[in-house]
Each structure stands twice: as C-alpha cells, then as structure tokens.
Amino acid sequence: MEPKDFQPEIKPPKPFCIEQFVGCSKEFKEKTLRLITLYHECLINARGGDDFMRYMYDVCLSLEQEMRQYNALAGFLLECNLFNLWNLFRNYKNKQSAESANTNPCALMAQQFLKFHTERLLVCTDRFFSTGCCSQINMPYDLCQHVFKFQQDLRKRCIASWKTLSGGRRAFMTVVQDIFTCFTTLRANELITPRQQAFFKLSYPPCRVQNVINILNVVHTQGIKDLKSLNMQKIKKRTPHAGIFSASGQPLFPIPEALLVDFNGEGIIRSDIADVSPFLQNPEEFLATDFFTYIKRFQGVGVQIRDPEPRYQPASQQPQQALRPQQQVLQQATAYPASVQAGGFAIQTESPMEGTSAQYFLAAQQHGVVGLFPSTATLVPIAGSTGVTEVVSYGHNSTSPVSTFSAPSTSVTEADHQTQPRRSRKATAKRKHQQVQDGNEDEGPQRHPQAHSRQFFQGAASHQTAQPAQVLQQSVIHGTQGALYFMGPAQQIPGDHSQIPVISNAMLQSVLQQQGGSGAAIYDLSQLQPCVVPVQQQAAQEVAVPTAVIHYQPAMQPQPQPYQQQQFLQPQQQAQTPSPQMQQRQLTPQSSPEPADEEEEGPLNLTTRTEDHEILEEILSNLYPEERRQQEQQHQQGEEAAPASPSQHEEQAGPSNQSGETSQELDIFSLHNLHLRKSLFE
C-alpha cells in the first residue's frame, strides 16, 4: 500500500477519540490515548514495535480488570470496548495508509478482531431474545428496547460488506452507553431481579483477553506481515438464490451468516440449548463469582471452557513471580492425597460444582469401600443380563491390589480350586439373556444393545480376604472372597497412576442414598458404569469373585411333575460328580470357553451351583413369605400330630398334589416354579 502523495504530514490522534469508551476510568482513557499515539508513531516510523506491544498487553489487561467491577455488565462492556479499540486501530490504519502499516501486529489483525467481536456480540444478542422466552425470563421493557436497537446495528454490520465495518463507531458506542445507563438505573431502583441480572451476565460471556494477547504475541514474535501466512479456515460462501427478499432489489441476505451456523464460542451456551434456566439455579452465587469460575462446573454439559496459557506476561506482573512458590506450596498442602491418586477412584481436585469426593469418606489415610462383592451378595438379573464392571481385589496379607478384571454377565467364576464345579450351560439362538463370552466391555453393549447391565450390590463388613477400614453396611460374613472398590493413599497402588477411574460426586452420593425394599442397604452401582474407567494395571494373579446368577426362561407348555423333580435333581448330581473337562478348566482358569451347542427352547430352567443353594432358597423365600409361613405351620402341626403310618400320610397328601394346591411336600423351588406357571397361563 503506497502512501498518499497529497498528504504532507499525518496528524496525530485527537483526545476526543477516546471519549466513546463506556464505563472506563479517566486513567484508563489517558493510557489508551497514549497507546493510540504510540500506534500512530509505529505506522509512520516503523520502529518501536516491542515497546508498543508490551504497552498494548498492559492496556488490554487493565481493561479486563476494570470491567469486572460491573458484574452482570462485565462481559457486555468488555466486548464492546474491545470492539471500539480495534475499530480505532483499523480507522487510523486506513486513514494514514502508511507503507509499513502491516508490520504492526495490531494493524494487521485489526480487521480480523473487529469481525470476531462483531459476530460474537451478534450471536449473544440473538440468543438473549430467544433463550429469554424459552427460559421464562421477562426482562424489563426499556432494557429490551435498547438491546433491540443494538441488535439492529450489529445485523447491518454483519450483512453489509466488511470494508464498511468500521463505520458508525460513535453511533454504535452511543447505543452501548444507553444500555449501560438503563441497566444501572434499573439496578439502583431495584427494578431488576437478581435472576434477570444473572441472565444478562450469562448471555454475554466476557472475552478471554489472554487469548487475544497470545495471538498478537505469535504474530509479533514470528514477524508475520501477511494474513496468508496464518493457518486460517476456508472462507464460507452462500450461493445466491431467488426468494421473496430478492424482490426488494437488495443483493444481500437478511440473516447474517453467523446466525446460520453453530457459533460455539468459549463460554457461550451451546446453540441447540434453548432453556438456560438450569444454569441459573443460584443467581446470587453467579453474580458474586467470576463468570468462568462459575460456568466451569458445566464443562461438557452445554459449555466448552479451556484455560488459556499465558505466553507473555507484562512487566506489571513480573513482581508477582516471587509469590508463586508460596502459592504452590499452599496448593500442595490443601490437595487430597487419597483422592488424586487413589486406589480405586481418582477424584478431580477442582470441581466447583460438586467439590471433591473425599468429603464422603474418612480422612486421607483411611480407606473407603464403595462397593463390595462377596459370594453372599447375589447378582439378580432384572430386565437384562447382570454384569460385574471393573473391580479391584485386595487381600488380607497385602494392601496392594492383586487383580483387575471384568466379569461377564452370565459367567460364574470359581472362588478357589476346591469348590464344586457347575454344569456348563448351553446357549441357544432364542435365549434372551445371551452370554457375552468376550471379556471386552466395550464390544459387549454394541453386540447386545438390549442387555443393559443393572447391578445391585449389598455392602458387607470386613472378612478374611478383604479388610477395609470403613464399610457401607455392617454385616457379619466369614470365609468369603470378594472384590471391592477401594479408596486409599496413593502408595497403595504400585506402578503407573496415570489411568485411574474417575467418579462423579453427585453420582456417588445419589447411589449411597438408595435403600432397598427388604430392609438391608442395597446400592445400585449401575449408574456408576458410564463414569468408571478401568484401571490399566498388570494382574499379579487371578482372584475370582463368586456370584450366583438366576436365569429365567418362559415355559411354553406345561410339563409333568416328574420332569420338574428331575430338573432340580440333575444339577445336584452333576455337582457331585465333576467331569474331567471341568477339572481341567479349574487348573487353567484363564482358558477360553468352549463353543456352546445349540438346543431347543425348553420350560423354566432354574440352575444354580450347589454352594449357592441356601442363597437361592433365601431369595425365593422372600418372594413368597405367606406360603413359606403356611408350610412351616403345617410342618410344625405335622410333627405334633405324629401321623400313624407313612401310608396314611401319603394318602392324605396325594389328593392335595393332584388338585394343584400347595402342600408341605413342595420345596421353595417347586413353589416358585408353580407360581411362574400359574402366572404364565393366566
């Protein structure tokens, strides 16, 4: 760009150019006037760029600090004042038309930052009107009138050519001053509620000044003088089309392009969220805290926040470096050593929404049991298969974990090599509860989308194999093996601590507050599955978690009574005579399962292991308490009556069995089978 020949000298900027800054102090305006004067000298002489850039960073940080005092108006005024500053830079660059204009980073990037602030203000203002109605927030009438004029000006700037973007600067800042005066008057007269103020603050998130400084620093240090050197996205174009708007003769589009795409800026609520009332649950707290400190608790839930790393710190912040070591020591003292690198869960140290999960447990040196899986805690399948998620097992002799594994839904692992083997089940094509043979948890839900794992675990006290310091539910269990979710000091886990599960506090608290219907504390940990990441650690040895799984299968046709008796006697005979294949499988616990054979769909099939016979009997007894009580009374009356002969007793019991009524000869399993058949035929 060649300088103008008819211009003998370039006049310096006049003091009235800085009068349009809204809400700024006199000292800041004087500092800004000196900044624009230095900018004028840099464009003419092409020197002094380093001093100017350092002063530019100081002015931007001072503007951000001054705008924080206005609370609800902080983001709105900061964005508008930055728009005014970049507008001045662009106007003086075009006015002087200096040969070395683009050597200055502020002159080179003035047009781009002006576009950025204009589109950002337009999107925020458009969402101010749309989300206000959807969130049932009625803003004051006078304030909405001024904001509507503000939106009209922004739409014209975004629709028109970007060459005339810097025009009308004073008129634009006059509308901003009207909004500032109206809002201040309403707040002084208590005509605007805290919820309305918080909504205005949420609608206009402040711009990250540190991001602007980082971009300018990169352009300055790398000596970029052409925008083609920057890694920028491809320019979006819209194809002209014939519509009703073309009848007016205007070659432009009525809707700005920024409103047609997803403009997900930092701190701005996602474009597909219309109701913002969940973000305004505590308006007083929102007004009393910093914007990004409050909105960070909604990270990933409608808002995207990232912490900018300062690449340049001005000289005004250099003396504060001596205080940094002391601040780091204080942060290390207040950190939670048991939660950052815990044995079972790693808790985030910063969580403004929920706090740290360590508050739900004992002190840092104590252990906390989140879930315990003993052999007496039966996993009952409800509306799908039952699965055991990633667990960590702890032994009695050592506090370090010995195994990390994932148990499939229908697979039953043996507690030790001396337990009774179980009859291998055959899979059918029509079986609703299919067995996931692969141990990979990620592939299981994809192949079986209907098999949602819902788990109910019952807390237990310390026993021979697990010795925690705190348990959720006190009960006496001896001689059992199990696995538990553990939280303890970092030295409890050897090896790498980089990949340790993270659990949400709100999710954990909601799980711990659930109560079962049978009187005992039942904790549904199925909701913890989405937020639990498996511990990546080598297993020293395999520790089994014995479980009892009940498979329910509908009966299509009634079967005679001898078949039912044979059905329940067969698992007991199979358990007493283990097969050579099961013995070989016990010796090699890590062997892959054999392919299952196909069989036809049969009647009700209730199979369990011999060692879990008492557990299943107790579960079924709780399902039918009245019938069980009647059987006990009949059994007591039968013992007192002492029948004359067994033949007479059989003659009396025979008709009752033939009539279909419950008698004392039916055990709890036959009673359960009878009830299922009755409900099926009904």
UniProtKB/Swiss-Prot annotation:
GO molecular function, one term: DNA binding
InterPro entries, A to Z: Herpes_TAF50
Keywords per UniProt: Activator, DNA-binding, Early protein, Transcription, Transcription regulation
Biased composition (Basic residues): 420-434
Pfam families with a match to the protein in the record: Herpes_TAF50
UniProt-listed GO biological process terms: regulation of DNA-templated transcription
Chain segments carrying region Disordered: 396-470, 558-667
Biased composition regions of type Low complexity, renumbered to the chain: 558-586
Annotated Polar residues bias: 396-413, 452-470, 654-665
The organism's place on the tree of life at top rank: Viruses
Family: Belongs to the herpesviridae TAF50 family.
Role of this protein: Transcription activation.
Protein name in UniProt: Putative transcription activator BRLF1 homolog
Native organism: Equine herpesvirus 2 (strain 86/87) (EHV-2)
